[in-house]
Amino acid sequence: NSSGLPDFLELLRLGGHGLDKPARPSDLMAACVRNRHLNFAPGSRFLYSNTNFLLLGAIVERVSRMKLGDFLAERIFKPLGMSHTALEPEIATIIPDLATGYLGDAETGFRRAGHAYPQGGEGGLTSSVEDLLIWSRHFDRPSLEPNDLPAQLVAPHPLADGHANHYRRGLAVGPLRGLQTVGHGGLWPGYRTEFLRIPGVDLTVVVIANLATINPWRLARAVAVEA
């Protein structure tokens, strides 16, 4: 996330096209290419951008000649036994046992969250606590090729000026009570998640919430501190 590419979700939102308005994969890609300007010179700073992941997913599909969800299932989910994890691109697909996502709070009232965007490299993966713990164990005992993939994901990736970048290759690294944490959060209308690993004490905390007002980042760290 040091490419400088503007976030296509923000570009669409600024253009009046919110997540509740139907969109096709081609619409998302068009939003990426319409803007010819970078936010900054590549490699000069960090700024999270969903565009990076959308384009990476498209590259995987082009090279593998497979749908991204099928590629992930064949290469990662099935070999690891992550039977409750999938990437379903079509929002109309019924996902068994998926919790309904909600917006609002007790004071203003709760309502079902909705979105109309297709799912791709930028997000929309559905999983379970148990499956994410399987994924966490893979970091300690890699069984997929290449075996050094977990190490590659957390390898230092400094900025062009030499300053450290806490965001590595799809994982964020940071401190907690003197220990290094590795993980990533996720959000989509009505859903919030946090995947937090503390390798130094062999601890993984997974928080999956189906209410937008919950803060999994804080919850995960509170649990880790008390563990």
Task: Please name every model-derived segment.
Residues 29, 54, 133, 201, ...:
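Hydrophobic alpha-helical segments
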Residues 25-31, 202-203, 213-214:
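Short C-terminal domain-edge/linker segments immediately following a structured domain
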Residues 1-189:
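Short, surface-exposed loop or secondary-structure junction motifs
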Residues 163, 181, 205, 215-217:
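Short acidic, gly/pro-rich beta-turn/loop elements at beta-sheet edges
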Residues 84, 175, 199, 211-213, ...:
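Non-catalytic surface loops within mature trypsin-like serine protease
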Residues 183, 194-211:
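Short, well-ordered beta-strand elements
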Residues 207-227:
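Short, gly/Ser/Thr-rich active-site loops of penicillin-recognizing serine hydrolases
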